[in-house]
């Protein structure tokens, strides 16, 4: 069990799983930074280690509320070479050894020769956010096995309390994934869901288990992400063309949906052709003479073109710019999650197919519509009272999506007023979530 005095002084050690800064997905990066921000809000001098499946070990520097913060990045591996110090099997073996020989000196010895063991064995608290939405098998069984089950189960084998930060739970469509999900959720200390349907989903999974209030609702942590102006912004001539009367609409195009998912065969069972839908949305918007459209990517994966937003945005820009010259603008270049949030903040209205692109807008009180491909959109918008601002592309026809966009656009002033009131309250709830993390 954690040492109480250790948790209240400058030596608090925190391990964060399911987070990464190198996936190219700005939503995942936003979740990672926001999670660390919340942890440091509770323990300002904590030593934070991100134990993930990223590219390489190292240090990552953050600027949080004007303060420079450095976190350690360690990579857990699931490859064929089971003898690597960072391999899941090696870590599991060490956990078993510590169960048999639970001596403090032995734990210190193992931690000193293997930093990956130390990250878990020496941790006072362990948190996991599962990339926000990977506690589900909709992205494939292998991904759920690693992120949804094995990483979390490993924490419990080190006899550490696991706190699941606000995320989406389910759907788990296979009996085996439901069984693994139940195994993890039963052993977690606290389970935070970022939507009310997630709370109910977990309760239903654990129907015969005494939960004692362990399942709680807290909105998505990315609402507290800091916006930061990048040194260089390339959005064409938008700022020169824009006038006081202009309405700038940000449009985030998902490369994953644009290419039909990983299978490239409408993997998410959308009811309408996504490429045609995006084109129709822009044509619909262009009826407003003062309107300008800024295409904003949110996932940068040039080596995985099926997911890459910039490639999708560029293709659509070339097609649309010919028809609407001087009214379509493209965000070019590479940006981090803070930069992209700043760029989204330049818009008056936003439409996104990446949920965290929408959150970047909403958290700055910018009215937004989510073109959804999964249930996570509905839950997050619902958490701030904007469930009507979701257009489910997997249930709605093209006409229905356009109707939802039109209603939100017409009501943007009302939505902005609503957001201005509720967003500060949402941020306070998220940051104060840490007050429940009592010393064991």
Predicted regions and their residues:
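Active-site anion-handling motifs in enzyme catalytic cores
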Residues: 1-440
């Amino acid at each position: 069990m954690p040492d109480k005095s250790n948790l209240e002084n400058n030596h608090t050690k925190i391990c964060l799983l399911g987070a990464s800064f190198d996936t190219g997905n700005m939503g995942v990066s936003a979740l990672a930074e926001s999670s660390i921000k919340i942890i440091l809000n509770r323990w300002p001098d904590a030593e934070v280690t991100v134990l993930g499946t990223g590219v390489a070990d190292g240090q990552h520097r953050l600027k949080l509320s004007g303060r420079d913060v450095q976190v350690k990045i360690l990579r857990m591996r699931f490859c064929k070479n089971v003898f690597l110090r960072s391999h899941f099997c090696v870590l599991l073996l060490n956990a078993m050894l510590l169960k048999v020989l639970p001596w403090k000196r032995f734990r210190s010895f193992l931690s000193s020769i293997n930093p990956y063991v130390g990250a878990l064995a020496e941790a006072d608290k362990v948190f996991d956010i599962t990339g926000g939405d990977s506690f589900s098998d909709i992205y494939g069984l292998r991904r759920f096995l690693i992120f949804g089950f094995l990483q979390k189960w490993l924490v419990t084998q080190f006899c550490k309390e696991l706190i699941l930060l606000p995320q989406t739970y389910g759907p788990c469509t296979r009996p085996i994934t439901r069984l693994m999900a139940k195994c993890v959720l039963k052993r977690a200390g606290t389970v935070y869901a970022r939507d009310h349907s997630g709370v109910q989903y977990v309760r239903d999974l654990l129907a015969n288990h005494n939960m004692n209030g362990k399942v709680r609702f807290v909105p998505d942590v990315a609402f507290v992400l800091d916006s930061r102006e990048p040194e260089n912004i390339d959005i064409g001539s938008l700022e020169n063309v824009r006038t006081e009367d202009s309405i700038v609409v940000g449009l985030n195009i998902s490369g994953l949906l644009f290419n039909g998912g990983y299978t490239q065969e409408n993997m998410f069972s959308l009811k309408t052709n996504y490429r045609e839908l995006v084109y129709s949305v822009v044509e619909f918007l262009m009826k407003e003479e003062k309107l300008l459209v800024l295409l904003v990517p949110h996932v940068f994966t040039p080596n995985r073109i099926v997911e890459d937003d910039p490639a999708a945005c560029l293709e659509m820009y070339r097609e649309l710019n010919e028809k609407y010259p001087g009214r379509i603008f493209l965000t070019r270049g590479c940006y981090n999650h803070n930069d992209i949030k700043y760029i989204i903040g330049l818009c008056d209205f936003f439409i996104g197919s990446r949920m965290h692109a929408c959150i970047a807008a909403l958290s700055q009180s910018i009215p937004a519509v989510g073109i959804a491909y999964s249930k996570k959109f509905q839950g997050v918008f619902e958490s701030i009272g904007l469930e009507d601002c979701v257009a489910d592309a997997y249930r709605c026809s093209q006409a229905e999506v356009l109707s939802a966009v039109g209603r939100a656009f017409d009501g943007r002033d009302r939505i902005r007023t609503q957001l201005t009131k509720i967003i500060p309250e949402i941020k306070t709830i998220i940051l104060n979530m840490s007050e429940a993390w009592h010393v064991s």
